[in-house]
C-alpha cells in the first residue's frame, strides 16, 4: 500500500512537471463568500487542503485553456483576513487575484482599498478581478455603480455563490487571465533565463569533462 501511495505522489508530481501551473489568490473581508464561491465552482470535484503553516486553504483544479492542460492552485485566506492583512508568502508568485466584497455589507466594499493597496505592494502587475457577491439577496444591486472598479480599471463581476450566477464565467476568466499573465510576465522571462543558465552550466560541465578525458588520453606514459 505504501508503494501505491508513493507511486500516486510521483504521478501527481509528474503532472505538475509536465503541465502549466498557475496560482490564483482570493482577497476580501471575512464572510464575503470567497470559500463558497470556490466550492460552487468546483462542486463535488474539489478536495480542499488545509495548510496550517501558511494559514490558508488550497483548492486544486485542472482546466483546459487553448488546448493546454492547466493545473490551477486557488489560495483562500482561511480566516487570516480577520487581521486585515495577509502574509507576504500568500502573494508570492501569484498570477491573478479575485477580490470579493458582499453587496449587502458596505464595510466590505469600503475595505477594498486596503486589500488592493496590499495586493499592489506585493504583486503590482497581476490581473485582478473585482467580485460583487450575494446578488441573489438583492438583484437591484447589479444596477448600482461601484466606482472602485472604474477607478482602478478592474473588471467587475456580479455573482452569487448561493445560486451560481456568473460563478463559472468568473473562474474561467480568472484562469485565462492568470495563464496570459504568466506567459507574458517577468515571471515567465525569469523561468526562461533560469533554463538558459542551467543549460549553460550543463554545457560547461560537459566541456570540462571532455577536456579532462582528452588530457588523460594525451598524457605520456611514465618511463
Curated annotation (Swiss-Prot):
Pfam families given in the database record: Ras
A single GO cellular-component term on record: sperm midpiece
Protein family membership: Belongs to the small GTPase superfamily. Rab family.
Binding site for GTP: 28-35, 76-80, 133-136
UniProt xrefs under SUPFAM superfamilies: P-loop containing nucleoside triphosphate hydrolases
InterPro entries named in the record: P-loop_NTPase, RabL2, Small_GTP-bd, Small_GTPase
Oligomeric and partner information: Interacts with IFT27, IFT81, IFT172, ATP6V1E1, HK1, LDHC, MAPRE1 and HSPA2.
Polar residues: compositionally biased ranges: 210-223
Record function comment: Plays an essential role in male fertility, sperm intra-flagellar transport, and tail assembly. Binds, in a GTP-regulated manner, to a specific set of effector proteins including key proteins involved in cilia development and function and delivers them into the growing sperm tail.
One GO MF term attached to the UniProt entry: GTP binding
Tissue: Isoform 2 is expressed in the testis and localizes to the mid-piece of the sperm tail (at protein level). Isoform 2 is expressed at higher levels in testis than isoform 1. Isoform 1 and isoform 2 are widely expressed and notably within other tissues containing motile cilia including the lung, trachea, brain, ovary and kidney.
Protein's GO biological process: cilium assembly; flagellated sperm motility; photoreceptor cell morphogenesis; single fertilization
Signal sequence coordinates: none
Keywords (A to Z) from UniProt: Ciliopathy, GTP-binding, Nucleotide-binding
Protein name: Rab-like protein 2A
Effect upon mutating residue 73 to G: In Mot; male sterility characterized by reduced sperm output, and sperm with aberrant motility and short tails
Originating organism: Mus musculus
Disordered: annotated segments: 200-223
Record note on disruption phenotype: Exhibits phenotypes characteristic of ciliopathies. Pre-axial polydactyly. Retinal degeneration, characterized by loss of the outer nuclear layer that contains the cell body of photoreceptor cells.
Amino acid at each position: 500500500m505504501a508503494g501505491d501511495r508513493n507511486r500516486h505522489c510521483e504521478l501527481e508530481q509528474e503532472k505538475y512537471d509536465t503541465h502549466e501551473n498557475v496560482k490564483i489568490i482570493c482577497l476580501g473581508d471575512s464572510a464575503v463568500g470567497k470559500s463558497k464561491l470556490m466550492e460552487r465552482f468546483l462542486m463535488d470535484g474539489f478536495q480542499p487542503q488545509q495548510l496550517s503553516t501558511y494559514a490558508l486553504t488550497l483548492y486544486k483544479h485542472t482546466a483546459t485553456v487553448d488546448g493546454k492542460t492547466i493545473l490551477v492552485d486557488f489560495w483562500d485566506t482561511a480566516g487570516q483576513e480577520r487581521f486585515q492583512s495577509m502574509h507576504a508568502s500568500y502573494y508570492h508568485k501569484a498570477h491573478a487575484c479575485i477580490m470579493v466584497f458582499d453587496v449587502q455589507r458596505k464595510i466590505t466594499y469600503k475595505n477594498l482599498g486596503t486589500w488592493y493597496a496590499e495586493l499592489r505592494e506585493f504583486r503590482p502587475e497581476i490581473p485582478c478581478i473585482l467580485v460583487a457577491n450575494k446578488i441573489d439577496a438583492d438583484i437591484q444591486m447589479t444596477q448600482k455603480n461601484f466606482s472602485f472598479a472604474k477607478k482602478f480599471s478592474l473588471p467587475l463581476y456580479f455573482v452569487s455563490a448561493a445560486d451560481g450566477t456568473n460563478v463559472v464565467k468568473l473562474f474561467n476568466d480568472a484562469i485565462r487571465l492568470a495563464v496570459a499573465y504568466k506567459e507574458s510576465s517577468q515571471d515567465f522571462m525569469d523561468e526562461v533565463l533560469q533554463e538558459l543558465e542551467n543549460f549553460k552550466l550543463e554545457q560547461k560541465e560537459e566541456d570540462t569533462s571532455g577536456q579532462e578525458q582528452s588530457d588523460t588520453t594525451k598524457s605520456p606514459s611514465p618511463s
